[in-house]
């Protein structure tokens, strides 16, 4: 058991978890966000989104001053008070967005895989795909260490594409709505472990951790967290963990921010 008073870190996915997948509303989670903020519990956003997108959302949600994990763990945006850490303000894992884009363009030209990346279109098109404003959609294109795409080929070709990426030291990851290509060494789990270790080094005590997510790309994060909330999501693959002990893992009945609130209610209000 744990409480909101003890050293605690909360890691949360965004789309489909803290944010509604369609409206991006987060108000059902607002009371818990306020309570965590008042208790000085860091809520660390962890998403496939770019750092630019997440900094905007972090401010909107009132969660400034703590680190965040962007681009599925390929980018760690450091906390404001961590200016002495090498790499400040961001730590980039693996190869850059530009290098990944070159690899993808070569595979598309030479092996004729069919996909559309966010680099292939303008912000108006991304706004149509996502329901974001054009200014917010423009932030989705500011990748530093990954590429986001829509797959437009067969499942068989996807398997071939994934194998080719793996040969080249890259991974192909499914998010709530889009696919993401990033360095094979990067991941939400790696980024979370680094942040946990940093907090432990600064405080002298390992914090208890709680994570929330709804998609397959959240599984690595939830595997390394002490307690996990799997928010009911839209993805047909769902989230499957190696350790689904009910004492550690709670699957919500509700979706999005209502599921987020349900998960917090389960692990805190019941204790």
Swiss-Prot record:
It is found in: Cytoplasm. One of its GO terms (cellular component) is cytosol. Its cofactor is Mg(2+). The keyword Cytoplasm applies. The keyword Isomerase does not apply. Its main location: cytoplasm. This is Mannosyl-3-phosphoglycerate phosphatase.
